Amino acid sequence: MAQKPDGGAGLRGFQAEASVEDSALLVQTLMEAIQISEAPPTSQATAAASGPNASPQSSQPPTANEKADTEVSAAAARPKTGFKAQNTTTKGPNDYSQARNAKEMPKNQPKVAFKSQNATSKGPHAASDFSHAASTGKSAAKKSEMAFKGQNTTTKAGPSATYNFTQSPSANEMTNNQPKTAKAWNDTTKIPGADAQTQNVNQAKMADVGTSAGISETDGAAAQTSADGSQAQNVESRTIIRGKRTRKINNLNVEENSNGDQRRASLASGNWRSAPVPVTTQNPPGAPPNVLWQTPLAWQNPSGWQNQTARQTPPARQSPPARQTPSAWQNPVAWQNPVIWPNPVIWQNPVIWPNPIVWPGPIVWPNPMAWQSTPGWQSPPSWQAPPSWQSPQDWQGPPDWQLPPDWSMPPDWSFPSDWPFPPDWIPADWPIPPDWQNLRPSPNLRSSPNSRASQNQGPPQPRDVALLQERANKLVKYLMLKDYTKVPIKRSEMLRDIIREYTDVYPEIIERACFVLEKKFGIQLKEIDKEEHLYILISTPESLAGILGTTKDTPKLGLLLVILGIIFMNGNRATEAVLWEALRKMGLRPGVRHPLLGDLRKLLTYEFVKQKYLDYRRVPNSNPPEYEFLWGLRSYHETSKMKVLRFIAEVQKRDPRDWTAQFMEAADEALDALDAAAAEAEARAEARNRMGIGDEAVSGPWSWDDIEFELLTWDEEGDFGDPWSRIPFTFWARYHQNARSRFPQAFTGPIIGPSGTATANFAANFGAIGFFWVE
């Protein structure tokens, strides 16, 4: 029973005032009351054993008659379990420890039901421990069952509680025929103000006395622990208070140790029933029918059972196609060569034959079809049409069907009168039968393989020459403005910016512009790339003295001539390292900005490459990557290898023939260039005669006011945005200068190189640029 905090003083006063005799008498009275209330009246045997500290008044020695009665009742009852007394030692006001003490009884005593408890108090404030041996009532064999309850109550009062009352649970030895076990309740009550929490768990265990060295009993006195591990279980319901959290633990078959951890105990022997197994009415896939399958929680495949594969129905047997009876052939003819048509024949509409046509060979045309001929087919020379074959009346031939030239028509083959011949169907050398005189042979006969192209061209449409010439003059001004940056001009740009709606006659407009450039300014329009259609402006030999002159690009062109010579002398290609090494000998370094040339690296790798003077590419299979320089497309048209070789020989005071390999290569290239120039001049003259381009194209007023500067890009307009600053010469002054110097006797430009006779003028010009050749 829990007491208030001031109740602790009353217990201490009771302990101090009570004498030893009163305490012993109180203990004896309590023991007798417990024995009288619990033991049956017919077979009650009381045995009390006092400890060494007990007083003589607390226990009386039994007489001889009482001992005899005790032995007779013990032999009749045959108790199974002996209880061990507990020895409780109190070491301090807040420290409690219990130790089990089993005392050895004399051998002359056959059975001892209870053992006394030894209570020792240490210190002035030691707690008083009252331990009472529980009495065990011996039940007779006729009793069906007996259950005893032992209560263990531990009460702590106040923060310095020092009293601990412990009662060992009373247990009854059950016989083999008893169906029920004893239950024990452990109630622990704690006052809210207590400092410590104590759990006192006392369990009644069945122990094997025969194996204990401290307890000796006669046969049948102690209960043997069965081999299957069955033992009395203590079912307890505990309430554990930890701070502000309370949880209730129902310990079923759980054994607790002193540290508080839990472990699962072995199940007692006996029949037990598992959870019901759900039953499914559907069979699993592949299972035999009419079988009730049970699906446990963890289903395992029975040994040896395998899922049966679903039976596949064999495909229905298809009947073989009906055998077709071959038609009877009339007059079979052996083919000597396969039928190969020169061009494929594509029918526009399906041809419906009125009657099945039987060919001399093994071919039967059943229904309308898209008939295609095999190219290269030639009819055999001995082939003849069947005499009774006639073409259908409403049959029309394909529009582009071409007959082989040596194919002979059958004599009795008649065409319908209203059958139109497709264009380009009948070759010119094909003989016309006599009965074809009523047809129109002349428009359909072709004279050459390119007759379709000639028909598409047709007669020249009437055009306004003045409008075409006006558009050509605008193109001339446009080309001269675009060529200022030396970037090749694309044909698509000319069509987009100038020609525009005259796209169908753009070849004539371009040719008229070329004629004006040559006659007025001594400039030639060259197509350097036939695939991308790139055009450049180069000077003609008649205007070499005036077109170059001295401009801001003269130093760059001189450096370009030196670079082209280095590339040519190194096998038409020079790596970047070789080129820069040669330029260093001339005082030019890639990291130093030149006052006239600017950034040398940008000039070589960007400007000259964009202008198509040089070709800058990576060396194949180079690791780390290396780059090399080659001649560009513009360099092949503005100069030649022979001119570059003469320039090198002039600088080094040597003969060009000293470099035999380079001289032979340059000579071959010069001959090829002459042949190409002659063929181009002939083709150009023929085209101009066909177009009617003559001196009237350059006659008439010429004005620069209609120059469309808005067509120029930002890069083409220049740094200051002044379109006129891009013109390197005065147009009319240059025109008159070119007119006076039609056939110059000496070359004064460094880009062209020296002529056959070296002049001091060339050396002076090249020396003024500041470049010197270094071996």
Curated annotation (Swiss-Prot):
Region (Disordered): 37-330, 374-407, 437-463
GO cellular component term of the entry, any: protein-containing complex
Tissue occurrence: Ubiquitous and in the seminiferous tubules expressed in Sertoli cells but not in germ cells. Expression decreases in all tissues with increased age and is detectable only in brain cortex and lung.
Pfam families cross-referenced by the UniProt entry: MAGE (PF01454)
Subunit: Interacts with DLX5, DLX7 and MSX2 and forms homomultimers. Interacts with UNC5A. Interacts with TRIM28 and PJA1. Interacts with NGFR/p75NTR and RORA.
PANTHER family, A to Z: MELANOMA-ASSOCIATED ANTIGEN D1, MELANOMA-ASSOCIATED ANTIGEN MAGE ANTIGEN
Protein's name according to its UniProt entry: Melanoma-associated antigen D1
Gene expressing this chain: Maged1
